[in-house]
Each structure stands twice: as C-alpha cells, then as structure tokens.
Amino acid sequence: MLRYGQFCPVAKAAEIIADRWTPLIVRELCFGPCAFGDLLFAMPLISRTMLAQRLKEMADAEVISIVPKAQGRGNLYRLTPAGEDFRPIIEQMSAWGQRWTQSIAPEELDPVLLMFGARRQIDLAALPAGRTVIRFEFRGVPKAKAKQRYWWLVIQRPETEVCLKNPGFEVDAVVTADLATFTRLVLGYVGLREVLGRRLVAFSGSEAAIALLCRLLQLPQQPTQKTFRFSSGFAAAVAAPKRSAATARIAAVA
C-alpha cells in the first residue's frame, strides 16, 4: 500500500482506495459478497498474487471482512461499514467516467463484461411474468474472444440469466450488432435512433420482446448520461457473475 506520509484525510483515504485494482474490487463487492474466483473472473487481467495482496490490505484497513463460505471450501469477501461508505465514491467515479472518458479502445471490448454488466443493471422488480429469450449476435468481436460472439439473455422471474450456450428455449427476438456500437449504446454514449439508422444495430422478432429488452437495459433513443446502480437490489446481486456451472462453461471457452 502506497503511503503519502500526510495526515490529510484525502491522503489517508487515497492510501486505501487509490491503489491499482482496489476500486474495481470495491465495485464488485458493492453488488454483494464475492469469492476469490468471482473476483478473478470479473478482472481477468489481475494476477492471483496481486488480488490476494489487495484483499489482505483491504482487510487490514477494515474495508472488507473475510468470512468462511456457508457451504464448501473457501471464503467470501464482503464490504464492512467502512467499505460501504466507498459506494458513493464508486458511483461518482462511474458518473465522471461516463462524462469524460467515452473512448473505448479495441482491446477494451469484452463481450463477457458487456453482457454481465448489462444484466446486473436490470431491476428484478421490473421483470414481467413469463419467459422472454433474446439472442445476441455480435460483429467485430476480437479474435481472441471469437467464441463469445453469440449470447442468450433469458428474462424470467425471479432473475435473468446470461448464457453463452443455447439454453434450448424458443427465441423471441434477435439482436444483431457491432460489438463496439452496442457497448456504447448500453453505456448511453450513442442512441438507438442513430445506431438503427446506420444499421449498426438491428432487431428482429417479437416487438414486445424488443420493447422489453430496451426498457430493461434502458437503451436510450438519444445519447445520455445514464445512472448505473451499484447495489444488490438488481440482477447482478452476485456482481461479476458468480462462478456457477454456467459461468464455468463461459470461462472454459473464453
């Protein structure tokens, strides 16, 4: 942990929150307790050694607590009250980033982050009765992630499910899109009117299913600064997807 050698509260807080990877760890824990593997999955560029070091530092600073899993081996990491107080900081960082850092480099495109990130912004209370299945077909996927071109979003109470393999349900609508464009659309950097007009994104299938998707993902008609939620009351209460069997299958082909 970097020390600034000052009693200034800004310096003291920065010693804890401003280290590399720490804000992203806090971001994930804002959605609920995570296992070590969950955090690795959410941040594929972090090494196991670095993650272990950051978690130890955060525990020493009493920003997180470490508790054994109720079932199975391993621990869960969760925010303490001190860590919870970082939540509005993460929200403000998100708002600042949306306003001032809208460029996305090709190497930053990530279908996994896009799909699970979009999923966890869905308000579970807004899910309708019945099941709706949306298939996504992305163009412009980086070669290293070519196996992540096709996705299915299963919208059904009590929560939504993101699948990299066909779940076997009848598809109600299909989204065909350039990956970079759809990423910018989900972030609010571009609007539906523009991307549909330029045929960078196309919808087909049930109009009701398409309308539901646009509403749940809050896809804007015009560019707008969206408010992203960092709480466990939404579909990503498990943060960066929990390492379920489905998640393990995704990791296996990534």
Regions found by a protein language model. Give the residues of each.
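Basic, amphipathic "hinge/linker" alpha-helix immediately C-terminal to the N-terminal HTH DNA-binding motif
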Residues: 18, 70-92
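C-terminal interaction segments
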Residues: 168-254
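Low-complexity, glycine/alanine/valine/leucine- and proline-rich hydrophobic stretches
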Residues: 135-193
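Amphipathic alpha-helical dimerization/coiled-coil segments
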Residues: 88-135, 207, 224-229, 235
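Short, hydrophobic-biased segments on the C-terminal half of alpha helices
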Residues: 55-56
